[in-house]
């Protein structure tokens, strides 16, 4: 996911995407805790995506 793609979305769409990413992060953390997570890189990828969405939301709020 690129920041330029996120900037084209509305705040409502970004909030929906943020909630989905937070759910994904929770599920990945639970899989890691139970030893079921084979692709550990997904945790950091989702974490970065969350940061991107939050950054774009803050930029839009500042305008």
Curated annotation (Swiss-Prot):
First and last residue of the signal peptide: none
Similarity section: Belongs to the universal ribosomal protein uL29 family.
Name listed for the protein in its UniProt record: Large ribosomal subunit protein uL29
GO terms under biological process: translation
InterPro entries per the UniProt record, alphabetical: Ribosomal_protein_uL29, Ribosomal_uL29, Ribosomal_uL29_CS, Ribosomal_uL29_sf
Gene Ontology molecular function: any one: structural constituent of ribosome
Recorded superkingdom: Bacteria
Pfam family, one: Ribosomal_L29
GO CC terms of this entry: cytosolic large ribosomal subunit
Record keywords: Ribonucleoprotein, Ribosomal protein
Gene expressing this chain: rpmC
Organism whose genome encodes this protein: Azotobacter vinelandii (strain DJ / ATCC BAA-1303)
């Amino acid at each position: 996911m690129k920041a330029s793609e996120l900037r084209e979305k509305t705040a409502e769409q970004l909030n929906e995407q943020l909630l989905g990413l937070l759910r994904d992060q929770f599920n990945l953390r639970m899989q890691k805790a139970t030893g079921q997570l084979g692709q550990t890189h997904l945790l950091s990828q989702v974490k970065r995506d969350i940061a991107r969405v939050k950054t774009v939301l803050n930029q839009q709020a500042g305008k």
